[in-house]
Amino acid sequence: LAYTGPMRRLLPFLLLLGLPVWGQGVEALWAKTCAQCHGEKAQGVRPYPGLGEAAPLFATPEGRRYLVLVLLYGKKGASGLMPGFAQLKDEELAALLNHLLALLKAKGEPFKPEDIKKERGQNLAPDQIKRP
């Protein structure tokens, strides 16, 4: 079965949304890795920030790279240290970013596992990750 046209671009995104992560879906992965600090809807849980200000980052190449680096290597912020999640699979990290993209109703293309893979192996420290 070959897909052409718009369906060819939409299919990877749809597959990521339905991707079983640890057998329970991306919502379970979000709850386990992100929601404890950033909230179920990315609204923030004191003292940790909401993620609404990240929405514009999804629309630029520099912003998208920054989001991937934060998930892989962590980030040092005013509220403390966010851990990196490099132990997760590329598909899982892409699914988390796509979940955030949907939560924020941000503009931008869905992330693919390849977007994560190309940033692995840099061994960056959290304080080296700078917002563009």
Ranges and model annotations:
Residues 16-29, 45, 59, 130-131:
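Electrostatic cytochrome c docking/interface patches
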Residues 24-50:
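Ligand/cofactor pocket segment of small-molecule handling proteins
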Residues 83-86, 90-132:
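Flexible coil segments in periplasmic/lumen-exposed cytochrome c-class electron-transfer proteins
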Residues 10-11, 21:
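Cleavable N-terminal signal peptides
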Residues 26, 30, 63, 67, ...:
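Stable alpha-helical elements in mature extracytoplasmic
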Residues 43-75, 79-87:
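Gly/Gly-Pro-rich "capping" loops immediately C-terminal to redox-active cysteine motifs
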Residues 2-10:
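Positively charged n-region of N-terminal signal peptides that target proteins for export
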Residues 30-40, 71, 82, 96-99:
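The canonical Cys-X-X-Cys-His
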